[in-house]
Amino acid sequence: MSFTIRFATPADAALLAELGARTFRDAFAADNRPEDLAAHLASHYSPALQERELRDPQCSFLLAESAGVPAGFALLHDMPPEPGVPGRRPLRIERLYVDKPFHGTGVGAALMGRCLDEARARGHDVIWLGVWERNSRARDFYARWGFTEVGETTFVIGDDAQRDLVLARPLS
Protein backbone atom coordinates (compact mmCIF):
# COMPACT_ATOMS: atom_id res chain seq x y z
CA MET A 1 0.00 0.00 0.00
CA SER A 2 1.39 3.41 -0.88
CA PHE A 3 0.86 6.51 1.18
CA THR A 4 2.30 9.97 1.63
CA ILE A 5 3.09 11.96 4.74
CA ARG A 6 2.76 15.73 4.76
CA PHE A 7 2.55 18.53 7.27
CA ALA A 8 -1.06 19.33 8.11
CA THR A 9 -2.28 22.92 7.77
CA PRO A 10 -5.10 24.85 9.48
CA ALA A 11 -7.30 23.82 6.54
CA ASP A 12 -7.02 20.25 7.90
CA ALA A 13 -8.51 21.12 11.31
CA ALA A 14 -11.91 19.46 10.77
CA LEU A 15 -10.29 16.40 9.20
CA LEU A 16 -7.86 16.03 12.13
CA ALA A 17 -10.67 16.51 14.66
CA GLU A 18 -12.69 13.71 13.08
CA LEU A 19 -9.70 11.40 12.53
CA GLY A 20 -8.34 12.09 16.02
CA ALA A 21 -11.68 11.42 17.71
CA ARG A 22 -12.27 8.24 15.70
CA THR A 23 -8.82 6.77 16.31
CA PHE A 24 -8.89 7.67 20.01
CA ARG A 25 -12.35 6.11 20.36
CA ASP A 26 -11.23 2.97 18.50
CA ALA A 27 -8.17 2.64 20.74
CA PHE A 28 -9.79 3.29 24.11
CA ALA A 29 -13.59 2.90 24.05
CA ALA A 30 -13.54 -0.71 25.25
CA ASP A 31 -11.55 0.20 28.38
CA ASN A 32 -13.21 3.46 29.44
CA ARG A 33 -16.64 4.56 30.59
CA PRO A 34 -18.66 6.12 27.74
CA GLU A 35 -19.17 9.38 29.66
CA ASP A 36 -15.43 9.73 30.33
CA LEU A 37 -14.59 9.04 26.71
CA ALA A 38 -17.22 11.52 25.48
CA ALA A 39 -15.88 14.24 27.80
CA HIS A 40 -12.33 13.65 26.62
CA LEU A 41 -13.25 13.71 22.94
CA ALA A 42 -15.28 16.90 23.36
CA SER A 43 -12.42 18.68 25.13
CA HIS A 44 -9.55 17.46 22.91
CA TYR A 45 -10.81 16.89 19.37
CA SER A 46 -12.95 19.83 18.31
CA PRO A 47 -12.13 21.50 14.99
CA ALA A 48 -11.47 24.76 16.86
CA LEU A 49 -8.92 23.11 19.16
CA GLN A 50 -7.25 21.34 16.24
CA GLU A 51 -6.97 24.66 14.39
CA ARG A 52 -5.46 26.30 17.47
CA GLU A 53 -2.88 23.50 17.73
CA LEU A 54 -2.17 23.69 13.99
CA ARG A 55 -1.40 27.40 14.37
CA ASP A 56 0.80 26.89 17.45
CA PRO A 57 4.47 27.24 16.40
CA GLN A 58 5.41 24.62 19.03
CA CYS A 59 3.18 21.99 17.36
CA SER A 60 3.61 20.14 14.06
CA PHE A 61 1.07 17.65 12.73
CA LEU A 62 2.15 14.97 10.27
CA LEU A 63 -0.73 13.54 8.24
CA ALA A 64 -0.45 10.19 6.44
CA GLU A 65 -2.75 9.67 3.46
CA SER A 66 -3.36 6.82 1.03
CA ALA A 67 -4.95 7.84 -2.27
CA GLY A 68 -6.20 11.00 -0.57
CA VAL A 69 -7.75 9.10 2.36
CA PRO A 70 -6.44 10.02 5.84
CA ALA A 71 -4.65 6.98 7.27
CA GLY A 72 -3.07 8.33 10.46
CA PHE A 73 -1.36 11.28 12.06
CA ALA A 74 1.26 12.32 14.56
CA LEU A 75 1.60 15.47 16.63
CA LEU A 76 5.09 16.67 17.56
CA HIS A 77 5.05 19.16 20.44
CA ASP A 78 8.11 21.13 21.54
CA MET A 79 7.28 21.50 25.23
CA PRO A 80 8.92 21.00 28.63
CA PRO A 81 9.44 17.27 29.25
CA GLU A 82 8.06 15.14 32.05
CA PRO A 83 10.47 14.45 34.93
CA GLY A 84 12.96 11.73 34.05
CA VAL A 85 13.17 12.53 30.34
CA PRO A 86 16.87 12.81 29.51
CA GLY A 87 18.63 15.03 27.02
CA ARG A 88 19.31 18.69 26.44
CA ARG A 89 16.57 19.25 23.82
CA PRO A 90 13.85 16.60 24.02
CA LEU A 91 10.83 16.66 21.69
CA ARG A 92 7.47 15.07 22.50
CA ILE A 93 5.34 12.88 20.29
CA GLU A 94 2.04 13.96 21.81
CA ARG A 95 -0.13 11.81 19.55
CA LEU A 96 0.49 9.05 17.03
CA TYR A 97 -2.62 7.26 15.77
CA VAL A 98 -3.39 5.09 12.76
CA ASP A 99 -6.95 4.64 11.52
CA LYS A 100 -8.13 1.05 12.01
CA PRO A 101 -8.40 0.16 8.27
CA PHE A 102 -4.69 0.99 7.96
CA HIS A 103 -3.41 -1.07 10.90
CA GLY A 104 -0.63 -3.38 9.78
CA THR A 105 0.10 -1.49 6.55
CA GLY A 106 3.26 0.30 7.67
CA VAL A 107 1.61 3.68 8.22
CA GLY A 108 2.53 3.74 11.92
CA ALA A 109 6.14 2.85 11.17
CA ALA A 110 6.33 5.51 8.46
CA LEU A 111 4.90 8.13 10.82
CA MET A 112 7.36 7.16 13.55
CA GLY A 113 10.27 7.28 11.12
CA ARG A 114 9.20 10.73 9.97
CA CYS A 115 8.84 11.91 13.59
CA LEU A 116 12.42 10.79 14.32
CA ASP A 117 13.71 12.46 11.14
CA GLU A 118 11.92 15.72 11.97
CA ALA A 119 13.23 15.70 15.53
CA ARG A 120 16.82 15.20 14.34
CA ALA A 121 16.48 17.87 11.65
CA ARG A 122 15.32 20.35 14.31
CA GLY A 123 18.31 19.63 16.54
CA HIS A 124 16.60 17.56 19.23
CA ASP A 125 18.63 14.87 20.99
CA VAL A 126 15.81 12.82 22.57
CA ILE A 127 12.24 12.02 21.61
CA TRP A 128 9.68 11.12 24.28
CA LEU A 129 6.00 10.27 24.72
CA GLY A 130 3.40 9.02 27.15
CA VAL A 131 1.54 5.74 26.69
CA TRP A 132 -1.23 4.19 28.78
CA GLU A 133 0.17 1.35 30.84
CA ARG A 134 -2.64 -0.94 29.58
CA ASN A 135 -2.09 -0.19 25.88
CA SER A 136 0.07 -3.21 25.10
CA ARG A 137 -0.18 -2.77 21.31
CA ALA A 138 1.31 0.73 21.50
CA ARG A 139 3.88 -0.26 24.14
CA ASP A 140 5.12 -3.10 21.93
CA PHE A 141 5.31 -0.75 18.93
CA TYR A 142 7.38 1.81 20.87
CA ALA A 143 9.67 -0.90 22.27
CA ARG A 144 10.45 -2.01 18.71
CA TRP A 145 11.53 1.58 18.02
CA GLY A 146 13.93 1.60 20.98
CA PHE A 147 11.84 3.55 23.49
CA THR A 148 12.44 2.73 27.16
CA GLU A 149 10.52 3.67 30.28
CA VAL A 150 11.90 6.74 32.06
CA GLY A 151 8.99 7.68 34.32
CA GLU A 152 5.25 7.87 34.71
CA THR A 153 2.56 10.52 34.66
CA THR A 154 -1.20 10.83 35.03
CA PHE A 155 -3.47 11.10 32.00
CA VAL A 156 -7.09 12.06 32.68
CA ILE A 157 -9.96 10.84 30.51
CA GLY A 158 -13.13 12.53 31.71
CA ASP A 159 -13.12 11.90 35.47
CA ASP A 160 -10.78 8.90 35.29
CA ALA A 161 -7.12 9.49 36.18
CA GLN A 162 -4.99 6.82 34.48
CA ARG A 163 -1.32 5.91 34.74
CA ASP A 164 0.74 6.64 31.65
CA LEU A 165 4.29 5.45 31.22
CA VAL A 166 6.77 8.04 30.00
CA LEU A 167 9.02 6.55 27.32
CA ALA A 168 12.05 8.10 25.65
CA ARG A 169 14.80 7.25 23.18
CA PRO A 170 17.95 9.05 22.12
CA LEU A 171 18.15 10.34 18.57
CA SER A 172 21.86 9.68 18.04
Question: Residues of each region from the PLM?
Answer:
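Acetyl-CoA-dependent GNAT
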Residues: 3, 7-13, 17-31, 35-103, ...
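Short amphipathic helical patch at the helix-1/turn junction of helix-turn-helix
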Residues: 98, 132-133
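Alpha-helical segments flanking ligand/cofactor-binding loops in enzyme cores
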Residues: 14, 139-140
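Conserved catalytic-core motifs of GNAT/GCN5-like acyltransferases
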Residues: 81, 128-131, 143, 148-165
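Conserved short alpha-helix immediately C-terminal to the canonical SAM/SAH-binding motif I
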Residues: 111, 135-138
